[in-house]
Regions:
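Rossmann-like NAD(P) dinucleotide-binding subdomain of oxidoreductase/dehydrogenase enzymes
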Residues: 1-131
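ALDH superfamily catalytic-core signature
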Residues: 63, 95-223
């Protein structure tokens, strides 16, 4: 028997807020489910506007598509634990995914998790090195590196290591950083001060552990 699962709680991240909302909403609506969407606290406006447009179209009955905003502990956790929510779909960190799985056990609701990872990009000596360098750089820097599948762990065979390092360094050094709304910018700011401090911490950690910076590494933390 195939039938709608019921009320679906959908919790989405901040790195692709509009796209993630569209992905989550479309399949649940197509399956005949009602939805409570919880966007990330850093990026709620795109989800609010999208659902406003959909609800104003009068294509859905009132109450089918709903949005709650707020921090995880205030909005996400109650949604995951609510006894009248039949399924939770979450995209985000592994740590939060574990908490959602635990919270969902109260009524044995269905759970689907799309969690982040850091599987490495590996370049072998028989690869098309120019293409591999371009692809690896794109995997590292796409969306400012704010991607759950970002290729920021890169391993290259010793025979091509220096060539790969030089190529990635050259690409990184030539990226134009600027305001996100400036069409000439190739990379805008990170999503929040919290994320900036986290990334800066990774740089400092690498330096303290003997890592060599081959491009960039300087940043302004005055504001």
């Amino acid at each position: 028997l195939r039938e709608p699962v019921g009320v679906v709680g959908q919790i989405i991240p901040w790195n692709f807020p509009l796209l993630m909302a569209a992905w989550k909403l479309s399949v649940a609506l197509a399956a005949g489910c009602t939805i409570v969407l919880k966007p990330a606290e850093q990026t709620p406006l795109s989800a609010l506007r999208l659902t406003e447009i959909i609800n104003n179209s009068n294509l859905l009955p009132e109450g089918v598509l709903n949005v709650v905003t707020g921090f995880g502990e205030d909005a996400g956790a109650p949604l995951a634990a609510h006894p009248h929510v039949d399924k939770v779909a979450f995209t985000g960190s592994t740590e939060v995914g574990k908490l959602i799985t635990k919270a969902s056990a109260g009524n044995l609701k269905k759970v689907s998790l799309e969690l982040g990872g850091k599987s490495p990009t590996i370049i072998f000596p028989d690869a098309d090195i120019d293409a591999a360098i371009a692809g690896a750089a794109s995997a590292i820097f796409f969306n400012h590196g704010q991607c759950c599948c970002a290729g920021s762990r890169l391993m290259a065979h010793e025979k091509v290591f220096d060539q790969v390092a030089e190529g990635i360094s050259k690409i990184a050094s030539n990226i134009k950083v600027g305001p996100g709304m400036d069409s000439s910018s190739e990379m805008g700011p990170l999503v929040s001060d919290e994320q900036f401090k986290k990334v800066s911490g990774y740089i400092e950690s690498g330096k303290s552990e003997g890592g060599e910076i081959i491009a960039g590494g300087k940043y302004d933390n005055s504001s």
